[in-house]
């Protein structure tokens, strides 16, 4: 089973906490021990926002700010690589070809951002499409997809299951509201819809949830099912030991 795991920077390393990075590395190693091929994409989180904010005050333009964000995601990727040790490719992949090659030779591929103007949400979806992944999992700081930003709307509805087309519509609505934050961005949602990759969005602050979702189909997040299929999201779990 080929899996792409997208880990938000604030989920992986809040405050650059080594124990949290180690715990996520342990979760990924457990997946590979169970026979999964894994590609991990790491976001920038609060550290990236801090750097971008300071650079903006110093007069950097938007492309330069995006480049700083990409650089920080790759630093976070290096933290995860350090925790994974010899099971991971030794440096962050800088494009999808490098990541795919690492996965084919049996390494854990780890990458951050790729180009300016594209989030690691979208990078994760593109990597899943490029590698023909069986599953794309977003480990975020919220427990799935809601009808609105749950941090802004206490009455936001939590979805346990939706189609990729419905995901696109929901994310588009959320992103129209200034100040609201979606668990994945609109480009990522559109790539998920195009590729038909099965997707889970969940709260990944406890990395055990990542393992349980991938290996056993057990989670409290949101299953995103390819349009036009009625197959259960957790169809692969029956084949796990």
From Swiss-Prot:
Enzyme Commission code: 2.7.4.22
PANTHER family: URIDYLATE KINASE, URIDYLATE KINASE PUMPKIN, CHLOROPLASTIC
Subcellular location: Cytoplasm
Taxonomic source organism: Halobacterium salinarum (strain ATCC 700922 / JCM 11081 / NRC-1)
Family: Belongs to the UMP kinase family.
Primary location: cytoplasm
Subunit-structure text: Homohexamer.
Binding residue positions for ATP: 9-10, 45, 49, 140, 146, 149
Function: Catalyzes the reversible phosphorylation of UMP to UDP.
Protein name per the record: Uridylate kinase
Notes on activation and inhibition: Inhibited by UTP.
Keywords, alphabetical: ATP-binding, Cytoplasm, Kinase, Nucleotide-binding, Pyrimidine biosynthesis, Transferase
Top EC class of this enzyme: transferase
Pathway involvement of the protein, from the record: Pyrimidine metabolism; CTP biosynthesis via de novo pathway; UDP from UMP (UMPK route): step 1/1
């Amino acid at each position: 089973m080929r899996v792409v795991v997208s880990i938000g920077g604030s989920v992986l390393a809040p405050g650059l906490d080594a124990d949290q990075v180690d715990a996520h590395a342990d979760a990924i190693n457990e997946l590979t021990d169970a026979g999964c091929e894994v590609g991990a994409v790491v976001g920038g989180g609060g550290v990236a926002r801090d750097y971008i904010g300071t650079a903006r005050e110093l007069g950097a333009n938007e492309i330069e700010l995006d480049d700083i964000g990409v650089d920080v995601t790759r630093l976070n990727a290096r933290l995860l690589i350090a925790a994974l040790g010899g099971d991971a490719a030794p440096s962050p992949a800088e494009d999808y070809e490098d990541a795919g090659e690492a996965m084919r030779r049996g390494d854990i591929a780890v990458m951050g951002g790729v180009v300016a103007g594209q989030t690691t949400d979208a990078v994760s979806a593109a990597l899943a499409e490029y590698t023909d992944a069986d599953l794309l999992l977003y480990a975020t700081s919220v427990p799935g997809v809601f009808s609105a930003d749950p941090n802004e709307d206490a009455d936001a509805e939590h979805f346990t299951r939706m189609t990729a087309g419905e995901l696109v519509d929901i994310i588009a609505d959320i992103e129209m509201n200034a100040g609201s934050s979606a668990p994945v961005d609109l480009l990522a949602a559109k790539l998920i819809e195009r590729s038909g990759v099965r997707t889970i969005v969940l709260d990944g602050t406890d990395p055990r949830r990542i393992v349980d979702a991938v290996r056993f189909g057990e989670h409290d997040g949101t299953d995103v099912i390819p349009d036009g299929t009625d197959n259960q999201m957790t169809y692969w779990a029956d084949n796990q030991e």
